């Protein structure tokens, strides 16, 4: 049994402006685990994702975020990324004028520099990334396109998964990855996420619906309400929520 804790959140209070959004939140995740976070709109799910990644709009007023036993509560988002924390956004942004090849190479080489490794030149990187692309069922012409510009919903999500694979993230936080996907695209994305899962990395899935969890089975499901985790259960929790709604947890 693995007793090592990858992510440990202790008594976290978070505000934005004068509004408190997270309240004394606790969460611990071991390597190799998949955790799903569910809850109604406005329950704090996406806020939690952004706070773990270090979004500057949110202020932590109490508590700690430990990643591999290192306190990352106050460190910059890019440093958290270098340590192995990856956030896939619900709505990935377009970056006109920047090709995927350039964007991915810069991100990858920044990670290598942090790890005290030599950067890859463009030719070496292209050979490296082509293998990653084929594993995620993307055409190599994808590299010459601008980041997310004119992409379908499925292509944007595949791009996020490619970044997750490229950076070899230890903790991937996927914020409503199923949003806007038809069933075929959802199955494809889920298959790719499952293929990247190892006993050394962990995944947080943030979702409203059971359908994503039909294809990616979580070890634990946490339900959030008003900035708190009010319930933690097994993978069958999603089916109960689908059948009875969130209110049954308050009965």
From Swiss-Prot:
It comes from the Eukaryota. GO terms for cellular component: chloroplast. Pfam families: ABC_tran. ATP binds at residues 39-46. SMART domains: AAA (SM00382). It is found in: Plastid, Chloroplast. The keyword Transport applies. The keyword Nucleotide-binding applies. Residues 7-251 form the ABC transporter domain. CDD domains: ABC_FeS_Assembly. This is Probable ATP-dependent transporter ycf16. It comes from Antithamnion sp.
